[in-house]
Amino acid sequence: MVEQNLLNLTVLFDLSDRLEIVLTPSQMERDTAIVNYLVKQFQYECTKNKNLLQCKNAMRVLFYPTPQISDVANLANNLDIDLAKCQYAEKKRALVDMPQNFKESLAAIYDKTLQQKQWVGSDIWGFFSNNKVDQYCIKQDYRNVVVILTDGFLYDKYNKQNQNGNEYSYLLPQTLNVE
């Protein structure tokens, strides 16, 4: 039985060329606005019953696959809050610091990704078909919510699936070459 007051919120980010400023100049602002809204909702859910001491909610930001840029992986650690693992004073501090930590860490992640121009993308197909969603996003007895920020492409260079010669997990210009 899911307790309605336990929230496990996961945001899956697509670090693809959708972040390229030339292609989509306002993408960072839009993503940041969405995450800021989710952070405010998370804070509200944690404090609405005035029982922060008992609150065990969790929120995290994921990148799948994990970027090879070590700074991004380190910054992502700032985007993981699990109040079940915190004492009361830590919970209060985590909630107070959360908006600024998320804002600064996301800005730094975007900056590092844009500097490196290593568009790892997001293997959404693999994330769901290989049960990574269960591993990373599902907590028993929680209301589990997964928000995906992507341009919708399922393509990942490490997960190219071609079944029966005409069913693909991706679509590239080369795929359409008909002879």
Q: What residue spans do the PLM features occupy?
A:
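Surface-exposed acidic, glycine-flexible loop patches that form ligand/cofactor-binding
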Residues: 1-3, 48-53, 132-140
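Ser/Thr/Pro-rich, low-complexity mucin-like regions
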Residues: 139-147, 156
